[in-house]
């Protein structure tokens, strides 16, 4: 983790065999301390100055409460006690995206507020002074992918099904997905100094 530099994006794929059994055993033996939690997520101390931000909603959907605790984790990351933040969970899937019912409950204003909050969280992750690492697996859809793409580094499991699937229900990936996809397409060209148009 010390070698990771903020503001650079690295994608690593785990081996097809999944996580080695000795690593799982070591993780299960490692004591973790709960730092903060709410009904939507939790922050754990993994030791060595590393925090884990775990989603806890049904299907790990992105909710306002989840993002509130995510902002708290990013604030903690600014203190000297913490060196890195990992986003993952011990669930069947990483995240199926935004909780649309939660967002639509507030009408057009609620949808706009939920979208803005997700955008702000993604930008706060990108601006974090220390590494933010996403470890997606299985289903990582919509808002879950938007959060993943905002991380400084991505360590993806070999079994990863991902996409900006909002289009299927008539929604533009407005939580940062369009911007992050474009950034990935244009950025390599911009680094060479060429005009992408």
What residue spans do the PLM features occupy?
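A structural preference for short, pocket-lining loop segments at secondary-structure junctions
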Residues: 48-54, 67-109, 119-137, 157-161
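Conserved catalytic cores of soluble enzyme domains
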Residues: 111-115, 123-197
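A broadly conserved detector of short glycine/acidic/proline-rich loop/turn motifs that flank catalytic sites
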Residues: 57, 91, 185
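A glycine-rich phosphate-binding loop feature that marks nucleotide/adenosyl-phosphate handling sites
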Residues: 3-9, 87-93, 135-145, 152-153
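Short, histidine-centered active-site or binding-site loop motifs used for metal coordination
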Residues: 55-57, 166
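NAD(P)-dependent Rossmann-like dehydrogenase/reductase catalytic/cofactor-binding core
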Residues: 1-47
């Amino acid at each position: 983790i010390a070698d990771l530099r903020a503001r650079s994006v690295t994608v690593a794929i785990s081996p097809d065999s999944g996580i080695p059994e000795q690593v799982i055993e070591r993780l299960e033996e490692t004591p973790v301390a709960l730092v903060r939690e709410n009904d939507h997520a939790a922050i754990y101390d993994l030791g060595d100055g590393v925090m884990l931000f775990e989603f806890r909603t049904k299907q790990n959907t992105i909710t306002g409460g989840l993002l509130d605790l995510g902002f708290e984790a990013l604030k903690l990351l600014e203190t000297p006690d913490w060196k890195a933040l990992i986003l993952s969970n011990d669930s069947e899937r990483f995240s199926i995206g935004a909780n649309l019912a939660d967002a639509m409950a507030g009408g057009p204003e609620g949808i706009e507020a939920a979208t803005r909050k997700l955008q702000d969280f993604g930008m706060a992750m990108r601006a974090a002074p220390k590494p933010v690492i996403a470890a997606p697996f299985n289903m990582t859809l919509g808002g879950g992918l938007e959060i993943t793409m905002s991380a400084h580094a991505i360590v993806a499991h070999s079994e990863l099904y991902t996409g900006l699937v909002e289009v299927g229900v008539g929604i533009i990936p407005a939580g940062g997905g369009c911007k992050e996809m474009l950034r990935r397409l244009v950025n390599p060209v911009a680094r060479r100094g060429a005009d992408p148009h």
